Amino acid sequence: MDRRTLLTRGTVLLGAVCLRSRHAIAAPPLMIEMKGSPRGEAVWFVPVGLAVSPGTTIRFVNRDPGNSHTATAYHPDILDRPRRIPARATPWDSDLLLPGETFEVTLSVPGVYDLYCQPHEHAGMVARIVVGRPGQELGWQDPTAGPGDLPEVALAAFPPVHAILEQGSVMQGRGEAT
């Protein structure tokens, strides 16, 4: 075997090992916290807006010692709510999370995902996750047009998609610094 063949085979083998190990190491989940004021008069997600790549796992953590919360996708299959996630995406509902409990969901379909806390939607406890970027992801889906039957306070709490894409995350919850 000559030197050139040996180097070529070694390079191919090294590349295969590196590629395999890159896929074997999963990125840790990104966290969205559920919070509330000490007396419970205000509740929110932190961050309220988050930009992620397709295939990212989100971990919702209830950090509110005085309340149970949910992380629920807006979708007709869940309490007949309007669909505010991409059409090909699978809806999710964490069920009630007690303080300290967590729930994870992996988002693979590009587009805008709006979610809410079932007991606190009328308090404006909503969040928006943007998966991928428009024009860069096949199958990108903009936010669902129209408010459906969402409370005004919930609609007002969603951060704009462009702000999420520019900043990566938006931290504008009640009681949180902006």
Regions found by a protein language model. Name each.
Residues 2, 7-178:
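Extracytoplasmic copper-binding redox domains, predominantly the cupredoxin/blue-copper superfamily
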